[in-house]
Amino acid sequence: MIFLMTKDSFLLQGFWQLKDNHEMIKINSLSEIKKVGNKPFKVIIDTYHNHILDEEAIKFLEKLDAERIIVLAPYHISKLKAKAPIYFVSRKESIKNLLEITYGKHLPHKNSQLCFSHNQFKIMQLILKNKNESNITSTLNISQQTLKIQKFNIMYKLKLRRMSDIVTLGITSYF
């Protein structure tokens, strides 16, 4: 059984046509995932315009007893603070490869996607929500200096000159 969370109708149709004999259920929120007996299940989450990955979502995904949780995104979060089997896969991957990965194909260790730490990911989310520096430091319980260093690292990874340029990137619709 596969739970699929996406707003992309083309992606949904591709999965429906290639699903083989596996049962596939489209969901609109993580709370719709219900464990069905002892059946193993997988979860696919498309982050494009979903704004789904936050602390509550990560905690919810940890509690699930899913075989695999695949997140379709143009980035991956290194050292994600979760015990769940979460895999970040590029959204540009072919539907056929996505299904093979979903069914258990081994993922290569080398990942050419952008790689953010868990804190960098949370900082980017808060910046995109127009939070100021004091709100960010208090929310994440980090110092001003740590925030400055993390912002510099984010700007370096995204090749930005100013942090305000982050809103012009195509990647922001995934946060």
UniProtKB/Swiss-Prot annotation:
<dbReference type="GO" id="GO:0003677">
    <property type="term" value="F:DNA binding"/>
</dbReference>
<dbReference type="InterPro" id="IPR016032">
    <property type="entry name" value="Sig_transdc_resp-reg_C-effctor"/>
</dbReference>
<comment type="function">
    <text>Regulates the expression of several genes involved in acid resistance. Required for the expression of gadA and gadBC, among others, regardless of media or growth conditions. Binds directly to the 20 bp GAD box found in the control regions of both loci.</text>
</comment>
<dbReference type="InterPro" id="IPR036388">
    <property type="entry name" value="WH-like_DNA-bd_sf"/>
</dbReference>
<dbReference type="Pfam" id="PF00196">
    <property type="entry name" value="GerE"/>
</dbReference>
<dbReference type="InterPro" id="IPR000792">
    <property type="entry name" value="Tscrpt_reg_LuxR_C"/>
</dbReference>
<protein>
    <recommendedName>
        <fullName>Transcriptional regulator GadE</fullName>
    </recommendedName>
</protein>
<keyword id="KW-0346">Stress response</keyword>
<keyword id="KW-0010">Activator</keyword>
<dbReference type="GO" id="GO:0006355">
    <property type="term" value="P:regulation of DNA-templated transcription"/>
</dbReference>
<keyword id="KW-0805">Transcription regulation</keyword>
<dbReference type="GO" id="GO:1990451">
    <property type="term" value="P:cellular stress response to acidic pH"/>
</dbReference>
<keyword id="KW-0238">DNA-binding</keyword>
<feature type="domain" description="HTH luxR-type">
    <location>
        <begin position="109"/>
        <end position="174"/>
    </location>
</feature>
<keyword id="KW-0804">Transcription</keyword>
<feature type="DNA-binding region" description="H-T-H motif">
    <location>
        <begin position="133"/>
        <end position="152"/>
    </location>
</feature>
<dbReference type="GO" id="GO:0005667">
    <property type="term" value="C:transcription regulator complex"/>
</dbReference>
